[in-house]
């Protein structure tokens, strides 16, 4: 069975939000919801746990899309793609600090939306795998347990592979 990607949209213009929703459904994505402001977006994203968030930069309320994206990245590890009409240097400088998984200028083509989402989902998956591996390695370094001394790491295909020496050498 194919996994369906769950998407959350943060867009303050309802017509644009509906257009994005229709495009996503046509492309085979599941839209969990739409918010037009930062506070609602954060609450719903926490509750619904989407795979990815499409974020307008200029939204209603005191929080910008950049503020919301920064919070989502720091606290919830959900990838964000900006969908915006703004490409000035100031906006780009602020947006890139949040390390978005994409930046699409409006108006956009469905193929651009689709390819950016697919690349972002793949990159986020790989980033998560690398982080888990890194966390595991740090836990071994911090581990004062005797079992850690019997573990060897071998580089294989640009990845570290854990080998338990007790499985290789027999006493």
Describe these PLM feature segments.
Residues 2-9, 13-38, 43:
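Two-component/phosphorelay signaling modules centered on CheY-like receiver
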Residues 1-5, 145-148:
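Extreme N-terminus of proteins, especially the signal/transit-peptide cleavage junction
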Residues 43-47, 51-136:
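CheY-like receiver
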Residues 8, 82, 169-171:
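Short, hydrophobic/aromatic-rich beta-strand segments within well-structured domains
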Residues 3, 28-31, 49, 77, ...:
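Short loop/turn motifs at secondary-structure junctions
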Residues 31, 52, 102, 167-170:
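Residues at the N-termini of beta-strands
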Residues 23-26, 44, 72, 94, ...:
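A general structural signal for stabilizing positions within well-ordered secondary structure
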């Amino acid at each position: 069975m194919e996994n369906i990607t769950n998407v959350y949209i943060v867009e303050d213009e309802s017509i644009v939000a509906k257009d994005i929703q229709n495009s996503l459904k046509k492309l085979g994505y599941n839209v969990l919801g739409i918010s037009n402001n930062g506070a609602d977006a954060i609450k719903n994203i926490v509750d619904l746990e989407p795979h990815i968030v499409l974020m307008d930069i200029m939204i209603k309320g005191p929080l910008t899309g950049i503020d919301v994206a920064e919070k989502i990245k720091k606290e919830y590890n959900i990838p964000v793609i900006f969908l915006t009409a703004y490409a000035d240097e100031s906006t780009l400088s602020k947006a890139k600090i949040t390390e978005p998984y994409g930046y699409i200028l409006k108006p956009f083509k469905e193929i651009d939306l689709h390819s950016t989402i697919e690349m972002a989902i793949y990159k986020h998956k790989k980033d998560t795998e690398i982080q888990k591996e890194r966390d595991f390695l740090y836990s071994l370094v911090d581990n004062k347990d005797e079992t850690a001394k019997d573990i060897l790491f071998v580089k294989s295909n640009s990845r570290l592979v854990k080998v338990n020496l007790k499985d290789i050498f027999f006493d």
